[in-house]
Amino acid sequence: MRIAFIEPAIAHVEPLGIASLVQMLLNDGHSVMYFESPRKGFVERLKKFNPDILAYSTTTGKHRLCRDLNEELRKSIKAISIFGGPHCTFYPEFIESSALIDGICIGEGDFAITELLKRIENKEEYIKTDNWWVRVDGQIYKNQIRNKVENLDALPFLNREVIYAENEQLRRTPIKRIIASRGCPYSCSYCFNKTYNFIYSGKGRVNYHRSPLNIIEELKLIKKNYPFSFLKIVDDTFGLNMDYEEFARLYSQEVGVPFLCNVRPNLLNQDKIKCLKKAGCVAVTMAVESANDYVRNKVLCRNLDLKVMSDAITALKENGLRVYTQNIIGNPGETFAMAMETFNFNVKHCVDFAECFLLTPFYGTEIYENCVKNNFLEEGINMDNMPQSYWLGSCIKFSSLKEKDKFINFHKFFSFGVQHPRLLPLIKILMKFSPNKLFVLFNRFYDSWRITRIIRVKMDIIILIGVVKMNVKYIFGFFLKTDSHSKF
């Protein structure tokens, strides 16, 4: 069969989920292509490929773009349309929003998609395929979840070539990304993992990780085919139940490229930090989220002591690692003084980059349910009019419109202010303006530049210009689309 994966924006990072499914399908003998709809000649190229399947990976917010694009494409392309990704996993009822959505994949797609396509290709009945809600002759059939993939080492390595054939800039960028594990045992209220673990109750362990050797073998293959000078390990929490010493030994000997990974402060100790340093880790991402005890532990359910985070940051910096924190403001019931605690915590610890997000209560998360229960959502908010991105606006109720604007603008200057705290008086003046696209652009470009100071990757001028152009297209093609709750 001929499968077309379709992305409604110019991807600025590799879509690893799609890349993993591509190789599974190729191994089954299918023909697979990846398309980005804003690119020149998209429809003509897609028609020339003549796909049997249109496939979309959706997140909440992007689901609207995918659905609308699919409806437009189906006017001239006769194909079966299937959707997967986080939005579909937590809201499979999405299939009911369009008669042209033929299938929704819930959870892991590795064997779900190969089994479904095998049955379709062989003209077998497929209405009882695990992990799928499917529409056949106008009727929707709902199926159970299959067990999790336990042996991640048995899965094929991601196919990046199909992605790079459409997005040459991703091929050329010196930064590559990899997934070393699946699953997270923590129950943060704003994150999908708690609900995901509930969906998979009795279907396998919460966390599975690849062996260090398997990770290294994939990295060696990437390095051979697509030379890179920096690696991002994008696991929710890197190294859960992994042999740090073995990884450090193999990575330093076989790969030797500086990398960044996500860590949880209560899981760190001096031995693990030294292993990370030995392996070649130069920076870590750590979720602070909030320095206010009530917001952090009661609202966001982080269950972390502030001292634990402080000690972890201190230990990391003492070992020469750069610290990249993630922070959330505009939380339900949060005052500006509480948000300033988070700002001041980052300033106090001289973090290298303090990324900031506006709280978006995604459907299916605990914090969404709490917002509904306690009337923290703005009137009329639903799945299809939630803010396009947590970098834009907020759908949380504030004490006043003025207070809401204050939070939205503070977000745009949060990371800049942490690096330049003496300019806080100026930032407070800017916060009095109405939220606007200029502030959004400043935030996106400053944060992008600041990340380069974390990873410190050298790029030749042609690649640098390409990266800038790719990010500009992504900003204007996705973030700055009109949104009824972003005020833009």
Q: What does each model-found stretch correspond to?
A:
Residues 2-13, 17, 22, 133, ...:
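C-terminal accessory regions of radical SAM enzymes
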Residues 2, 10, 17, 21-24, ...:
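Glycine-rich beta-alpha loop elements in corrinoid/cobalamin-binding modules
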Residues 9-10, 60, 237, 265, ...:
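Residue-level signal for short, function-critical loop segments
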Residues 157-324, 344:
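Radical SAM [4Fe-4S] cluster-binding motif and immediate context
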Residues 8, 37, 86, 236, ...:
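Cofactor-binding loop segments of dinucleotide-utilizing enzymes, especially the Rossmann-like FAD-
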Residues 92-99, 272, 333-348:
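Catalytic cores of alpha/beta
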Residues 238, 291-296, 300-302, 313-338, ...:
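Conserved strand-turn element in the central/C-terminal portion of the radical SAM core barrel
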